[in-house]
Amino acid sequence: MNENLFTSFATPTILGLPAAVPIILFPSLLIPTSKYLINNRLITTQQWLIQLTLKQMMTMHNTKGRTWSLMLISLITFIATTNLLGLLPHSFTPTTQLSMNLAMAIPLWAGTVATGFRLKAKNTLAHLLPQGTPTPLIPMLIIIETISLFIQPVALAVRLTANITAGHLLMHLIGAATMALSTISLPATPIIFTVLTLLTTLEIAVALIQAYVFTLLVSLYLHDNT
């Protein structure tokens, strides 16, 4: 399909539907409420995964930091769902757009920094100057630490965008090679198709890992400010 300059501004669609519709409905289908005293295996597995994720991220936090538990589990569910839905044929992955990832990263990062200034302003400002810094280097180090602080949300967004985009490009290139070789050399087609299948499996893992990494880094930023 030919694309023009304004393709990135088009509304993302998944199987002909706006991407926002299945993304909003998908969590309610994945995590249904049980009407019985004993949950079935699917709900039990989902609750175990949620508790395991929260245990990995929230153990290091104090009481103030643990108030973000619902936000973080919602974030990892949203990113993982978006990444996985983007692997469906004829669909679009919103997390390949830097603008969307920045729209997620900047408010979350700003929230952690604002929490730090509200709870312990002195300690938050102290992070801008490492302990034991020589006096002549103090102005330069404050500038460097301030720049590194403001780079954090950009690094979050760029990391997610680059990893998801790179995987999709590889799948597109290998898929195109499979189609081309099917008309040139039939014996080579199964080999490349096997590689494409393995790459798709790897992309599923990358989609889940990147959701975890993004949420974990937000959790670490929160830990530094609470």
Swiss-Prot record:
One Pfam family named in its UniProt record: ATP-synt_A
Q: Please list every transmembrane segment annotated in the UniProt record, as residue ranges.
A: 12-32, 68-88, 97-117, 138-158, 164-184, 200-222
Q: Please name the GO terms of the biological process aspect recorded for this protein, alphabetically.
A: proton motive force-driven ATP synthesis; proton transmembrane transport
Annotated GO molecular function terms are: proton channel activity; proton-transporting ATP synthase activity, rotational mechanism
Q: Its catalytic activity?
A: H(+)(in) = H(+)(out)
Q: How does it sit in the membrane?
A: Multi-pass membrane protein
Q: What does this protein do?
A: Subunit a, of the mitochondrial membrane ATP synthase complex (F(1)F(0) ATP synthase or Complex V) that produces ATP from ADP in the presence of a proton gradient across the membrane which is generated by electron transport complexes of the respiratory chain. ATP synthase complex consist of a soluble F(1) head domain - the catalytic core - and a membrane F(1) domain - the membrane proton channel. These two domains are linked by a central stalk rotating inside the F(1) region and a stationary peripheral stalk.
Question: What does the UniProt entry say about where the protein is found?
Answer: Mitochondrion inner membrane
What GO CC annotations are associated with the protein?
mitochondrial inner membrane; proton-transporting ATP synthase complex
Report the family membership: Belongs to the ATPase A chain family.
Which keywords, in A-to-Z order, does the entry hold?
ATP synthesis, CF(0), Hydrogen ion transport, Ion transport, Membrane, Mitochondrion, Mitochondrion inner membrane, Transmembrane, Transmembrane helix, Transport
Where it mainly occurs, coarsely classed, is mitochondrion
The superkingdom of the source organism is Eukaryota
How does this polypeptide assemble, per the annotation?
Component of the ATP synthase complex composed at least of ATP5F1A/subunit alpha, ATP5F1B/subunit beta, ATP5MC1/subunit c (homooctomer), MT-ATP6/subunit a, MT-ATP8/subunit 8, ATP5ME/subunit e, ATP5MF/subunit f, ATP5MG/subunit g, ATP5MK/subunit k, ATP5MJ/subunit j, ATP5F1C/subunit gamma, ATP5F1D/subunit delta, ATP5F1E/subunit epsilon, ATP5PF/subunit F6, ATP5PB/subunit b, ATP5PD/subunit d, ATP5PO/subunit OSCP.
The residues the entry assigns to the signal sequence are none
Q: Which organism is it from?
A: Hylobates lar (Lar gibbon)
Q: What is this protein called?
A: ATP synthase F(0) complex subunit a
